[in-house]
Each structure stands twice: as C-alpha cells, then as structure tokens.
Amino acid sequence: MTISIHSQTKFDDYNFFREKMDEVIKKYPNISKCFTKRSKTTEFAIKYFEDKNVICEQPDLAIKKLTKLRRLVEITDLSIFFYREDVVVGAELTKNTIDRVKKLNKEFIIFEYDN
C-alpha cells in the first residue's frame, strides 16, 4: 500500500505525528511506500518509518505546487492530512487537496492538530 502524507507550514509536532501514525499503522499494516511534499513532513516520515521497512520519498510530479499535491493523491491508496482550517498559510491549499481526494473517491484520514 502506498500512502501520501500532507501537512501545513505550521505543523511541526513530531510526537503528535508519531501518535497518529501509530493509529494508521494499526489500521493499515501493509504500508510499503510513503510520499510527501513538504520537507518537514518528509523528515518526520523518514524518522517514523526508519525501522518499519517503508520507503519514504518526495516525488517530483509537477512544477506547480497544487498540481504536485493533486498527483500525489492520485497515485496513492491512502492520503493522510495533518490539518487546521484556521492556519493562514497552507489551509486553503490543503483543503483543495482534501476536496480532490474526495472527488476521486480515494481513502483519506484527517488529523486536526492544536498548536
């Protein structure tokens, strides 16, 4: 199973990330590949999956950011979002990506964070 992990600019809580990814792994134990877009998310994913035999990478799918995000959700089985609507930077972009996942009838999980 291939997943994509999406987070907003302000998201930087590894402990929350780890806790929520533990929930994901329990529900989806057959994850083999993880795609990310944001550097901090990639850093978290690599750290989290380092002993779980999961390959993490940032594929270069397009030039424009929104197109990259759309393609990420198109090529994966499950999209995971760390999201807060009230975050000024990135909230609209993330919302558009979530809408795209819904339109494609793909599986997704949203974790709303506090800080």
Kindly label every feature range from the protein language model.
Residues 12-115:
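Acidic/glycine-enriched connector segments
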Residues 1-16:
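Glycine-rich phosphate-binding "P-loop"
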